[in-house]
Amino acid sequence: SPKSLFIKDIQIYKLDKTKILFYEENKVSYIIKSLKSSLLNNNKDIKLEGNVRLYDLNNKANTINANKAFWNIDKYEFTLIGDVILNNNSIKVESSKAILNKKENIIKFFKPVKYRYLNNSSDLNYKVKADNAYYDLNKQNLLFESKNARIKSNLNF
């Protein structure tokens, strides 16, 4: 961060233009950027705000955008809140909230979920609406779930 401020009374670091690198086996696997962030609870929690972007370096096509994100450093879960969008070369998934579980490498998108298949070489237009969706980063597959309502699909040729 190019600018940081430590507030001693409440033990919080405030940072601007944050860039966080996540390592797995001494190799960068994710990069997270935001306009500002705070280190809370004796540096155990990170709160990111403003144009939060997560880049998956294991699959460079995957990017996730959100308004805010929270991460407890001791846990494997990263919570994204507000206008959450997963993009890659073939899909776009949108929801108001998502949780990335790093241990399982699965992203759970919460109600309401909108999905769109992206393929520029085809006239196929495929849309799905569901309560929840689960995206497996390793297998690159997507599972939809609705508890009380039917999953709505729309195919246009």
Name every feature range the model reports, one short phrase each.
Residues 1-157:
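Mature-chain termini and adjacent capping regions
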